[in-house]
Regions:
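Conserved anion-binding
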Residues: 76-77, 83-130
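Conserved N-terminal beta1-alpha1 strand-loop-helix module at the mouth
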Residues: 1-76, 82-85
Length: 130
């Protein structure tokens, strides 16, 4: 079965560029689901360049919106994810100098840390991918 996930990061990019509360990522997420999307993807970056902590909180509270939260291995970001219980977590590399995610996770360097993170999410019934 084909499933459609919509990434709404750039809704937040426009909002932040306008220094406004609009467009609202939560409204965009609800609209995407209403129009047939199966899930929403957002990336909470360490620098918060688009999605903010409050966006994660608000979207996670909407249980009708299946959320795939992309996060780095940063402990502060992990705490936010664990506290808000998204449906899915995708662990992604992050480099502050990059414009968008480039490359992959260094599994050999971070294997034990990644294993520990996956166990934490599994214990909360949050599916995790790399």
């Amino acid at each position: 079965m084909k499933r459609l996930g919509i990434n709404i990061d750039h809704i937040a990019t426009v909002r932040n560029a306008r220094k406004s509360s609009h467009p609202d990522p939560l409204v965009a997420a609800k609209y995407a689901i209403k129009c047939g999307a199966n899930s929403i993807t957002i990336h909470l970056r360490e620098d918060r360049r688009h999605i903010k902590d409050l966006d994660v909180i608000r979207i996670c509270k909407e249980k009708k919106i299946p959320l795939n939260l992309e996060i780095s291995l940063n402990h502060k970001i992990l705490k936010i994810a664990l506290k808000n219980n998204p449906n899915y977590i995708c662990l992604v590399p992050e480099n502050r100098k990059e414009i968008t995610t480039e490359g992959g996770l260094n599994l050999s360097k971070n294997l034990n840390k990644i294993k520990d993170i996956i166990i934490k999410f599994k214990n909360k019934n949050i599916r995790t991918s790399l």
